[in-house]
């Protein structure tokens, strides 16, 4: 006598599945750090930005990640260049 068994095993717990969400990136802390009229020292970061939302004016340096920083001690001055552009300068006196 011969017996033929056909055994099928199924999962006894539901699979977890996959999702495309569920991640978050670290904060980048972008934005204006020193505002119009504030006193700054040489090397102070004025704006951290992606691209040149603000352009470097007088006595300002620009980093490789478009960070604007002061080259001299003085006061921050936000200025308009034409209709759309904005620039930031540092002046030694108000």
UniProtKB/Swiss-Prot annotation:
It holds the Pfam family Ribosomal_L27. The keyword Ribosomal protein applies. Keywords: Ribonucleoprotein, Ribosomal protein. The N-terminus is cleaved by ribosomal processing cysteine protease Prp. It comes from the Bacteria. GO terms for cellular component: cytosolic large ribosomal subunit. GO terms for biological process: translation. PROSITE patterns: RIBOSOMAL_L27. Gene3D superfamilies: 2.40.50.100. Residues 1-10 form a propeptide. GO terms for molecular function: structural constituent of ribosome. Belongs to the bacterial ribosomal protein bL27 family. This is Large ribosomal subunit protein bL27.
